[in-house]
């Protein structure tokens, strides 16, 4: 109700502004999408986390992918013209080669709805936070020792706090390194556009302007297909 009231006031007052937000498109209705567009919505950021419903359920994310896709369609139908940043947490608990392929497919599905030139996947790994269910799970599974120090500056300990275990970590790393090739980036950079003109740091610049996250996902898809992942679904 508060969200609708704010948007309605912006529309009623005819305020000429552009706003952005971190949202859950799974909660967007056709009416809300209309209000968002009429009130001046710009770019949006969405935590999709994974393209696998199984992984999302295991992480207790509390939404269904079908509803997220519907929200994107409602935005498109309402006339949304901004960019959509999709946050993925690769190699989450429960991820497999098959679910990674599902994440690639989810990006493609959203890009087909809104347009590839307006959908920007950003790739993250889950950070371990003390006194959380995630931390307790990792202790029970033996990934973390029961007496570990979350404030330790030991490089091995710090690395473990960013959850990206093998064997999927190696597959993801190869896809990232190919996408982050410095020479290819320099050749593709738009003429006259610098990092400092557009974004606070180089990572955001390359993530949005160069769409490096998309390149990582496409590389990952190619590697997974080469390993035979998902091929059975594509056979007639």
Please report, for each region that a protein language model flagged, where it lies by residue:
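Active-site-adjacent beta->alpha loops and helix N-cap segments on the catalytic face
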Residues: 3
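A structural motif corresponding to the C-terminal lobe/cap of the Radical SAM core domain
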Residues: 7-204
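C-terminal non-catalytic accessory extensions
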Residues: 200-236
